[in-house]
């Protein structure tokens, strides 16, 4: 049988679920994830810990399902909404991920709308 893996990096937890060919949930595993608040209005996530959480929940879900990773034919990934996750040329995170609840950049879209940048970027 072929299996499918869903991976969800939500705002408060990371979850992995294994489904069979009929769409039946075979196994699920999850864990809470920490939000970093280095300053008021800043919300971030440690990218290395996020990677470790993903690996852990995938490992647990596959183990609970009683299958091997080779039996998974497709992986679907979703997340918490908007955010910024920067990777360097060395395939390492440049900095902590910035979460959608972070307020430090709220003024940029307002400024871009006023000065015409938004219109230029989305010209058809």
Report residues per predicted region.
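N-terminal glycine/serine-rich phosphate-binding loop of ATP-dependent small-molecule kinases
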Residues: 1-96, 106-107, 111
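Glycine-rich phosphate-binding loop plus the immediately following alpha-helix
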Residues: 101-124
């Amino acid at each position: 049988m072929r299996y499918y893996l869903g991976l969800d990096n939500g705002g408060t937890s990371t979850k992995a679920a294994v489904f069979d060919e009929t769409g039946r949930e075979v196994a699920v595993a999850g864990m809470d994830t920490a939000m970093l608040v280095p300053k008021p209005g800043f919300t971030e996530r440690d990218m290395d810990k996020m990677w470790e959480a993903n690996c852990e929940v995938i490992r647990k879900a596959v183990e609970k399902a009683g299958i091997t990773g080779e039996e998974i034919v497709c992986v679907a990934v979703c997340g918490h909404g908007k955010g910024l996750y920067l990777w360097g040329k060395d395939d390492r995170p440049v900095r902590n991920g910035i979460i959608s609840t972070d307020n430090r950049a709220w003024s940029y879209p307002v400024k871009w709308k006023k000065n015409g940048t938004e219109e230029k970027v989305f010209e058809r």
